[in-house]
């Protein structure tokens, strides 16, 4: 009986340890990826009469090599929330969140032309969309102030806005997206946010990877 009792206690400890590990993994996953509800997608929600996604009916190539050698980091802050599906909200987070303080300078990631500077109360708050010469578009959300206007040309590194906490946001941060013909590319596939650089000088877009991210 003593041996059986010892085995039972050991088994209970094992189950308890497994639950603790699973709970810890779930907690960390939720802490890192689900701390904030993803923004309603300005490219698909249809609220913008100016057609934020002007590529809706365009034929998108299966693959495309994109030159990202001439770049600037949008801000020096670290990543607080990655790109990816949010189980709790059943919605994609189609960009990354980067730590900023209100008033921090936000910079254009590549050369290009400002397409939109708008306000969207349900998600992005004050945001900027830039169409770049390398055919990417970038989106910068939750801003506090615009430093550029639509149709203005900018160079990589030019100040475009100040960081903020507008729209659906629980604290100051920059929501940053990279898009190709309407498809939301994982910014971390292009940028190494930890080391403040790009992974390579050329990024290869593969349509199959992002079929659910348009």
Give the positions of each predicted feature.
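Polar/charged, compositionally biased leader and regulatory segments
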Residues: 1-82, 198-214
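A structural signal for short beta-strand/turn segments enriched in small hydrophobics and glycine
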Residues: 106, 112-114, 151-163
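Short hydrophobic beta/alpha edge segments that flank linear recognition/processing sites
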Residues: 98, 126-130, 155-167
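Active-site loop architecture of trypsin-fold serine endopeptidases
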Residues: 122, 163-175
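Short glycine/threonine/proline-enriched tight-turn/helix- or strand-capping micro-motif at secondary-structure
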Residues: 56-63, 78-107
């Amino acid at each position: 009986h003593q041996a059986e009792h010892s085995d039972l206690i050991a088994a209970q400890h094992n189950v308890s340890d497994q639950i603790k590990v699973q709970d810890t993994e779930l907690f960390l996953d939720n802490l890192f990826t689900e701390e904030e509800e993803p923004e309603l997608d300005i490219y698909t929600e249809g609220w913008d009469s100016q057609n934020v996604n002007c590529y809706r009916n365009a034929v998108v190539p299966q693959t495309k090599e994109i030159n990202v050698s001439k770049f600037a980091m949008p801000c020096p802050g670290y990543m607080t929330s990655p790109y990816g599906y949010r189980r709790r909200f059943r919605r994609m987070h189609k960009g990354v969140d980067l730590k900023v303080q209100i008033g921090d300078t936000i910079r254009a990631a590549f050369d290009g032309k400002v397409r939109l500077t708008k306000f969207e109360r349900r998600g992005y708050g004050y945001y900027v969309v830039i169409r770049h010469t390398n055919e990417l578009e970038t989106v910068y959300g939750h801003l506090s102030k615009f430093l550029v206007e639509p149709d203005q040309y900018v160079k990589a590194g030019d100040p475009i806005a100040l960081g903020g906490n507008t729209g659906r946001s629980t604290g100051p941060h920059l929501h940053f997206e990279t898009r190709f013909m309407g498809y939301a590319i994982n910014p971390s596939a292009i940028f190494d946010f930890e080391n403040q650089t790009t992974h390579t000088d050329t990024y290869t877009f593969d349509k199959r990877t992002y079929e659910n991210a348009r």
